[in-house]
Amino acid sequence: MAKKYDAGVKDYRETYWMPDYTPKETDLLACFKIIPQPGVPREEARAAVAAESSTGTWTTVWTDLLTDLDHYKGRAYAIEDVPGDEEAFYAFIAYPIDLFEEGSVVNVFTSLVGNVFGFKAIRALRLEDVRFPIAYVMTCNGPPHGIQVERDIMNKYGRPLLGCTIKPKLGLSAKNYGRAVYECLRGGLDFTKDDENVNSQPFMRWRHGFDFVMEAIEKAERETGERKGHYLNVTAPTPDEMFKRAEYAKEIGAPIIMHDYITGGFTANTGLAQWCRDNGVLLHIHRAMHAVLDRNPHHGIHFRVLTKILRLSGGDHLHTGTVVGKLEGDREATLGWIDLLRESYIKEDRSRGIFFDQDWGSMPGVFAACSGGIHVWHMPALVTIFGEHAVLQFGGGTLGHPWGNAGAAANRVALEACVEARNEGHELEKEGKDILIQAAKHSPELKTAMETWKEIKFEFDTVDKLDVAHK
């Protein structure tokens, strides 16, 4: 018997609230934090989010009868209270994998964080976490190369990599920019980098900048016998221009390029990652604009979701925050998304804000890049927090050294001392001060850096904290 079409407005709960539903292995699972408008029941709010982010609209439509709505609809299957927050609650929603185009993080985001975020019945909405089923993960190409391949390309093993963002970030001519790159690489760094807003400005057009940077890299490599690199930012006004810059970087021998994946867009980023894989070029990812989306604890997208999206879209490095520097970052939450970048399988762990198990299959891991207000005194904590597969990037903490290019040498000595102490079984965060003092006895560069920044701290409370019960 044909189904009967009943016109009119139907309560979302009748179709999209399914507390008895058991999610399938192939379902994409999402956890939303919801604050409904006054008078809107929780059950209605969670069902509305499931509807508006999948197949629903505000009224019943006759075209529902032309498809298998039960197969395609999102299902709100559970809710939980948010510890310490009486207004908010968590809603867990399962989406059938067929709702999403294969390999398209753009399509996933368009559904999960699209129109639903402007829904009037919801006062605040935040996407806290997503479980991507392995069946979907395997449709994405992911990082162009990954951690192990990068170590092989750069011939660097057994320690975090060391970098520096060239400062001032804007205003240097191409020749002076190249000089700064050379001094940093010659002093002992593995990488230098463009900052996120270095593109092609009147003071330094991109091609001139690329040429002087490659000249600096080649000179530093000849003098040190080490592989060196600089993240050449190919973010551009159009995809065609972006690929033109990437092609030129490859032509002149650059080992690594850079992209601002949020401001540049996920379509551009996924395409660039595929190009890097095909052309043997490493890809560093900057997260400029992330805090607009993730810093508000009640509305937006949590950074752990942006981390997962980047791993699917593609990048060999991603900025993750530092915990100890000048930028926002809760320690346990940061450790959580670092694991989501690097590990093959991550278990649910609410103490670190991870709501779902996540299986990445054979997808390569991503280097965690930490930068922002860090200096030599932070080195013991950074090596402890980030471990081996990280890029520690000191901008002002390199170029702010009173002796100029000695800042690079100071950071290299501090890193080597901490890695050696770690390998000998020392607890770096407890013994770090003594480790650095001992190393400084043989390094005037490190000693001066320690004296310069001994009073510098960034002691501000984290805005976006993990949701835990107030004591």
Curated annotation (Swiss-Prot):
At what residues does the UniProt record annotate the site feature described as Transition state stabilizer?
326
Molecular function terms in GO for this entry? magnesium ion binding; monooxygenase activity; ribulose-bisphosphate carboxylase activity
Which residues act catalytically here? Answer: 167, 286
The note on the cofactor says:
Binds 1 Mg(2+) ion per subunit.
List residues traversing the bilayer.
Answer: none
- Which Pfam families does the annotation name? RuBisCO_large, RuBisCO_large_N
Amino-acid positions noted as binding Mg(2+) in the UniProt annotation, renumbered to this chain: 193, 195-196
Residues where N6-carboxylysine is found:
193
Highest taxon of the lineage: Bacteria
Required co-factors: Mg(2+)
Which keywords belong to this entry? Calvin cycle, Carbon dioxide fixation, Lyase, Magnesium, Metal-binding, Monooxygenase, Oxidoreductase
Q: Does the keyword Lyase apply?
A: yes
Give the record's GO biological process terms: reductive pentose-phosphate cycle
What EC number(s) does its UniProt record assign? 4.1.1.39
Q: State where substrate binds.
A: 115, 165, 169, 287, 319, 371
- Reaction catalysed by this enzyme: 2 (2R)-3-phosphoglycerate + 2 H(+) = D-ribulose 1,5-bisphosphate + CO2 + H2O; D-ribulose 1,5-bisphosphate + O2 = 2-phosphoglycolate + (2R)-3-phosphoglycerate + 2 H(+)
**What is noted besides the main data?**
The basic functional RuBisCO is composed of a large chain homodimer in a 'head-to-tail' conformation. In form I RuBisCO this homodimer is arranged in a barrel-like tetramer with the small subunits forming a tetrameric 'cap' on each end of the 'barrel'.
As for what it does, the entry says: RuBisCO catalyzes two reactions: the carboxylation of D-ribulose 1,5-bisphosphate, the primary event in carbon dioxide fixation, as well as the oxidative fragmentation of the pentose substrate. Both reactions occur simultaneously and in competition at the same active site.
Query: Which family would the database say this protein is a member of?
Result: Belongs to the RuBisCO large chain family. Type I subfamily.
Its assembly, as annotated, is:
Heterohexadecamer of 8 large chains and 8 small chains.
User: Matching PANTHER family, A to Z?
Assistant: RIBULOSE BISPHOSPHATE CARBOXYLASE, RIBULOSE BISPHOSPHATE CARBOXYLASE LARGE CHAIN
What name does UniProt use for this protein? Ribulose bisphosphate carboxylase large chain
